[in-house]
UniProtKB/Swiss-Prot annotation:
Pfam families recorded: p450
GO cellular component, one term: endoplasmic reticulum membrane
Primary location: endoplasmic reticulum
Catalysed reaction equations from the record: an organic molecule + reduced [NADPH--hemoprotein reductase] + O2 = an alcohol + oxidized [NADPH--hemoprotein reductase] + H2O + H(+)
Membrane topology designation: Peripheral membrane protein
Protein name according to UniProt: Cytochrome P450 6A1
Keyword vocabulary terms for this entry: Endoplasmic reticulum, Heme, Iron, Membrane, Metal-binding, Microsome, Monooxygenase, Oxidoreductase
Entry cofactors: heme
Enzyme Commission designation: 1.14.14.1
Family: Belongs to the cytochrome P450 family.
Residues annotated for heme binding in this entry: C449
Keyword Ligase attached: no
Superkingdom, taxonomy of origin: Eukaryota
Length: 509
């Protein structure tokens, strides 16, 4: 046998072995007697992920197909087996009752080579517990009240800019405007920096924030490899954040930290808290103080959480209200009733937190558009888990499980006519009739959204201010139906959000 023939033979053997391994791996759930859909040779059950479909849509489709017939179907993320939790009682166990066995999210991060991914949302085990305990004090109601004045000041600038833009055109891109509002809020609260992106069309914080969420570093195939083989990917030094995003935020945070430490500046904001953790070696139990990279990661995720989730939530709310003037008028009436008690819209924090219909509108928005949780929650088993009362279902240690938030939120048994935008679903009477795990706008259990209070404050104020001063209707450039960006980590619009805007109050001088 000559060398060429031997090489072809060897390649054939390797290809056969690879195909055998792939087929054996795809028999993972069948060998356990757990139903699943037939997987694609390369992409498993997530064919079209990030190119055509958002992960939330794929998991929601599983919910619709298997609900009522199976409590825990299997799914393949590329070649990685995972499961989708459909049963409500099992959902409670995963998120709350048996949380100790599902404390990790199972998401890829690489602290060594991609340090900004080592943040509270991603990290696991004792490190997560310690960070959660130490970071929680910055999100108390008292801290929110301290940060509130900053949000209020930026809110006034938001109104000024919108009035100015209306002198040029009545059709405004509210997605862009609200993203700039939130960038300026978070820039001040997290970095102590006046971004002024509302007036600066080329603000770098805004551009890098968008890129970190909407522009993946790798294509879908490479991301499927990372998801399937996370430990190998870490050993290979694989990163997920774009390089320019990494460099921008690391340098921005370092400059701010150096300036504060050199000049002994304190603002009692989020950055001050993580600086205290960095400089106090006893502050995090078994782990010691925060390193600079760990500090930077927490500031980075705080920026992303406040920037994208709040702006998209407000944008989606305006999109729905623009199509339903009756709901918009009712919200405006309740907002005005409270705001009229304060001079020049300087509403207090406590008053803002007590506008019930505003809360209902935002909760219904997060039902239809679960921005913060990315339309699906993930958890990972820390040990083998036998499903109570159903021993057929055993999740081996390390199994990733999905909570299909989008599927739950659009379940007609829970929310009749789920495509309809109806804030009455969140009246006190209706909320009492549902279980907490039937609405997961901020997650549930010990690993819910730590920044929930801040996100609510930011979204409530921004939405209340613009509804008080402007009327919103759809225009020829409004994207109906709304299209979602399949590449985005969060549940965000694919296109701009143009609405017709009409001023209905005099400009505050």
């Amino acid at each position: 046998m000559d060398f060429g023939s031997f090489l072809l033979y060897a390649l054939g053997v390797l290809a056969s072995l690879a195909l055998y391994f792939v087929r054996w791996n795809f028999g993972y759930w069948k060998r356990r007697g757990i139903p699943h859909e037939e997987p694609h040779l390369v992409m498993g059950n997530v064919k079209g992920l990030r190119s055509k479909y958002h992960i939330g849509e794929i998991i929601a489709d599983y919910y619709r197909k298997f609900k009522g017939s199976d409590p825990l179907p299997g799914i393949f993320l590329g070649h990685k087996p995972a499961a989708v939790v459909l049963d409500k009682e099992l959902r409670k166990r995963v998120l709350i009752k048996d949380f100790s066995n599902f404390a990790n999210r199972g998401l890829y991060y690489n602290e060594k080579d991609d340090p900004l991914t080592g943040h509270l949302v991603m990290v696991e085990g004792e490190k997560w517990r310690s960070l959660r305990t130490k970071l929680s004090p910055t999100f108390t109601a008292g801290k929110m009240k301290y940060m509130y004045n900053t949000v209020l000041e930026v809110g006034q600038r938001l109104l000024e800019v919108m009035y100015e833009k209306l002198e040029v055109s009545s059709e405004l891109d509210m997605r862009d405007i609200l993203a700039r509002f939130n960038t300026d809020v978070i820039g001040s609260v997290a970095f102590g920096i006046e971004c002024n992106s509302l007036r600066n069309p080329h603000d770098r914080f805004l551009a890098m924030g968008r890129k970190s969420i909407e522009v993946p570093r790798h294509n879908a195939l490479i991301m499927a490899f990372i998801d399937s083989f996370p430990e190998l990917s870490r050993k290979l030094g694989m990163r997920v954040l774009p390089e320019d995003v990494h460099q921008f935020f690391m340098s921005s945070i370092k400059e701010t930290v150096d300036y504060r430490e050199k000049n002994n500046i304190r603002r009692n904001d989020f950055l001050d808290l993580v600086l205290d953790l960095k400089n106090n070696p006893e502050s995090i139990s078994k782990l010691g103080g925060l390193t600079f990279n760990e500090l930077a990661a927490q500031v980075f995720v705080f920026f992303l959480g406040g920037f994208e989730t709040s702006s998209s939530t407000m944008g989606f709310a305006l999109y729905e209200l623009a199509q339903n003037q009756q709901l918009q008028d009712r919200l405006r009436e309740e907002v005005n009733e409270v705001f009229d008690q304060f001079k020049e819209d300087n509403i207090s924090y406590d008053a803002l937190m007590n506008i019930p219909y505003l809360d209902q509108v935002l909760n219904e928005t997060l039902r239809k558009y679960p921005v913060g949780v990315g339309s699906a929650l993930t958890r990972q088993t820390l040990n083998d888990y036998v499903v109570p009362h159903n021993p057929k279902y055993v999740l081996p240690k390390g199994t990733l499980v999905f909570i299909p938030v989008l599927g739950i939120h659009y379940d007609p048994e829970l929310y009749p006519n789920p495509e309809e935008f109806d804030p009455e679903r969140f009246s006190p009477e209706m909320v009492k009739q549902r279980d907490s795990v039937d609405w997961l706008g901020f997650g549930d259990g010990p690993r819910n959204c730590i920044g929930m209070r801040f996100g609510k404050m930011q979204s409530r104020l921004g939405l209340a201010l613009v509804i008080r001063h402007f009327r919103f209707t759809v225009c020829s450039r409004t994207d109906i139906p709304m299209q979602i960006n399949p590449e985005s980590l969060a549940w965000t619009p694919k296109n701009n959000l143009y609405l017709n805007v009409q001023a209905i109050r005099k400009k505050i001088k």
